[in-house]
Structures are given as structure tokens and as C-alpha cells.
A protein has these predicted regions:
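Active-site loop segments of alpha/beta catalytic cores
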Residues: 5, 18, 28-306
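N-terminal accessory beta-strand-rich subdomains and adjacent acidic, glycine-rich linkers
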Residues: 1-29
Length: 306
């Protein structure tokens, strides 16, 4: 394992056998410290042109230190692969600066003071988005915004609070991406049903990962919202591990109904665990490649009402 102190004055531990790191301490532990918190210059060229710790892309089976410069990585993939920029929005920054428990407490204890901190975080994210697009020099195909604003049953906090303090800044980020011709995929695990219409209102081009374990179903969402928004994900990783091959084929072909007319990228609904045998992983990928061609031929799994 490894312990890392981040630029957000927090410490996380990465156990190599566990997919995600665990935050163990935060220096910003009072609302007064949050109000005094200073974000590092989002336009600092070192973010894009210098090697160093990448505390998002560096996380994998281990934790990579001193990763290549961001722009070098972009150039190594472009144009052979679609290359998306990425940015955390305020909710994800709260996880990294104060932790989700403090965030939820402060919404109740200090709603306006905490709300101003959220707004400052999104102002930082907006400027970092602009700087990233400029540094890429036209080499990006789109943008992913990391939010993670929900759990299995609902969003973490009142949708009205989110609309007041989080949504305006998020929309500004989306607008800047669109001004540069970059479609936006918004990432939030959990059940975000209560704000799906807000996603559409903000101009989110697609939602990821449509967590099946949070009672989201891509076919139902396509019924409800049509092609106002795209979808990425929804293959339940628990089913992927537990179901037999016939069951997997039924699941995959049924979900591919959401691809009618475009707008669906088939993906896992969360991080792929090591409980999925490589043979099953490969089987699902081959199914998508075979049956995900247009015109779709889904046989007995074709749904007439889509």
C-alpha cells in the first residue's frame, strides 16, 4: 500500500488489492478553514506540461507515481482513440477536500456558508476546464465531468439545494465545453432520477454510468427521455460476475434496444471487479461487437416500442 498527501490538503491510502483509494484525513475540518481554503492557480502550466503525480489517472491496480505530462499522454492517444478531457465538479472536490460526511453535515449546519464554498469550487473547476481546453490545442474530442452526487437510493442532498448551489456552476462548465464543440459526459454513480431533467436542462450530452444496482435501467430511461440525452453504461457488474452465458446474452441484447437511433455506449455500471472471470468479460464484449452493429438485429430480444 501507499499513503499520499494531496494538493487539497488531504491524505489518502491506496491498498493495491483494493480498486479505489481511501481518504484517511483532511486538514480542512472546520467551516472556517473551508472559507479560508485557497485553490491553487488553475492555469498553472505544470498541470499540463510537466510530469508528476496524477491522483486520478494514477489510480489502478497499484498507484503510479510521476506519471507523464498530461499533454504528452493526450498526444500518445490522439487521433487513434477518442480523447476526452476531464474535470471534477464541486461535489467531487468536496469529497477530496473535506469528505462526504462533513459535506452533508455542513449543508445542514451552515447551508449558506457551505454553499459559497461549493460555488468557489465550481469557479475553480470552470477556470481549470478553460485552461485544459487551451492546453490541449484542439486534440480533445469531448469532456467528462466527474460528480458522483448520489448513492443507491437517491441524490446525497436535497435537489433544491443542489439546484441553488451546485447546478449553476456545473452548467457554466458544460457551456464552455459546448462553446469549443466538445460533448459532455456527466459521471455520477447512484440513483439520479430526481435530477435527470436538470441534466437535460443543463445540456448534458450523456450520463454515465447509469448504475443498474441503483435501480436505473437504460431501456426505461430511453422510454422516458427519448433522445434528449445519451447514455453510457448500465451493465450490472454483479450480473456480469454471477450470470451464466445465456442470461448474459439476454441482458446484453435487451439493453442494446436503447441504442436504437444512437445515443448509447454500452459499458459497465461501475468499476469492473476481479470477480468477473476474463472469459465472461470477453464474452460480453464480443456480444456487443456482434449485435451492436447497425441495423440492430436483436432477434427475440427486440422491443417493438422503442
Amino acid at each position: 500500500e501507499i499513503t499520499v498527501r494531496t494538493g487539497f490538503e488531504a491524505v489518502f491510502r491506496k491498498i493495491y488489492s483494493v480498486p479505489m483509494p481511501e481518504y484517511v484525513s483532511y486538514d480542512t475540518d472546520t467551516i472556517e478553514k473551508a472559507e479560508a481554503f485557497e485553490f491553487i492557480d488553475p492555469r498553472d502550466d505544470r498541470r499540463f506540461y510537466s510530469a508528476g503525480d496524477n491522483q486520478i489517472a494514477g489510480v489502478g491496480d497499484g498507484f503510479s507515481r510521476n506519471t507523464p505530462a498530461w499533454l504528452d499522454t493526450v498526444k500518445s492517444y490522439y487521433p487513434d482513440f477518442p480523447v476526452y478531457g476531464s474535470i471534477c465538479e464541486a461535489n467531487e472536490y468536496m469529497t477530496r477536500i473535506i469528505g462526504i460526511e462533513k459535506a452533508l453535515h455542513w449543508i445542514g449546519q451552515f447551508p449558506e456558508r457551505y454553499g459559497r464554498f461549493v460555488e468557489r469550487a465550481n469557479e475553480f473547476a470552470l477556470e481549470l476546464t478553460k485552461a485544459q481546453i487551451k492546453a490541449a490545442g484542439g486534440l480533445l474530442d469531448g469532456f467528462v465531468v466527474w460528480g458522483d452526487m448520489a448513492y443507491s437510493n437517491n441524490v446525497f442532498y436535497s435537489p433544491d439545494y443542489w439546484r441553488k448551489y451546485y447546478k449553476p456552476g456545473l452548467k457554466k462548465i458544460i457551456d464552455v465545453c459546448h462553446e469549443h464543440g466538445l460533448p459532455v459526459i456527466y459521471h455520477s454513480c447512484g440513483n439520479v432520477n430526481k435530477v435527470y431533467e436538470d441534466f437535460i436542462d443543463m445540456g448534458v450530452d450523456a450520463h454515465n454510468p447509469i448504475e443498474a444496482k441503483a435501480d436505473l435501467d437504460v431501456v426505461d430511461l430511453r422510454h422516458q427521455y427519448g433522445h434528449q440525452i445519451g447514455f453510457c453504461g448500465n451493465m450490472n457488474v454483479m450480473d456480469w460476475a454471477a450470470c451464466d452465458y445465456d442470461e448474459l446474452k439476454k441482458i446484453v441484447l435487451t439493453k442494446l434496444n436503447a441504442a436504437k437511433g444512437g445515443g448509447f455506449i454500452f459499458q459497465s455500471d461501475h468499476s469492473v471487479p476481479n470477480s468477473i472471470p476474463p472469459e465472461k468479460y470477453d464474452y460480453v464484449v464480443k456480444l456487443v461487437k456482434e449485435y451492436g452493429q447497425y441495423p440492430l438485429k436483436l432477434g427475440t430480444h427486440d422491443l417493438d416500442n422503442l
